[in-house]
Amino acid sequence: MKLTCVLIVAVLILTACQVIAADEADANRLSTRWCACGVNYYCCNEVCTWREDPCP
């Protein structure tokens, strides 16, 4: 029973780490697009948009 609990906890921790890593990859991709668009622009649907305009 103890071993089963340890295995379940280990799987949950690994899953959480994978989700966090995926989120960080998305954040890095967004920041790269931000830099490619310029300081006052953001990437919206792969189009550079002025930072104060809504996403088209």
Curated annotation (Swiss-Prot):
Family, similarity comment:
Belongs to the conotoxin O1 superfamily.
Disulfide-linked positions: 35-44, 37-48, 43-55
Q: Which GO terms describe its molecular function?
A: ion channel inhibitor activity; toxin activity
Task: Output this protein's name.
Answer: Conotoxin Cal6.22
Q: Output the InterPro entries linked to this UniProt entry.
A: Conotoxin
Tell me the organism's taxonomic lineage.
Eukaryota, Metazoa, Spiralia, Lophotrochozoa, Mollusca
Task: Kindly list the places in or outside the cell where this protein is found, as annotated in its UniProt entry.
Answer: Secreted
The signal peptide, as residue positions, is: 1-22
Tissue spec. comment = Expressed by the venom duct.
Supply the alphabetized keyword list: Disulfide bond, Knottin, Neurotoxin, Secreted, Signal, Toxin
Comment, domains: The cysteine framework is VI/VII (C-C-CC-C-C).
Which GO CC terms are listed, alphabetically? Answer: extracellular region
Domain of life, per UniProt, equals Eukaryota
Q: What does this protein do?
A: Probable neurotoxin.
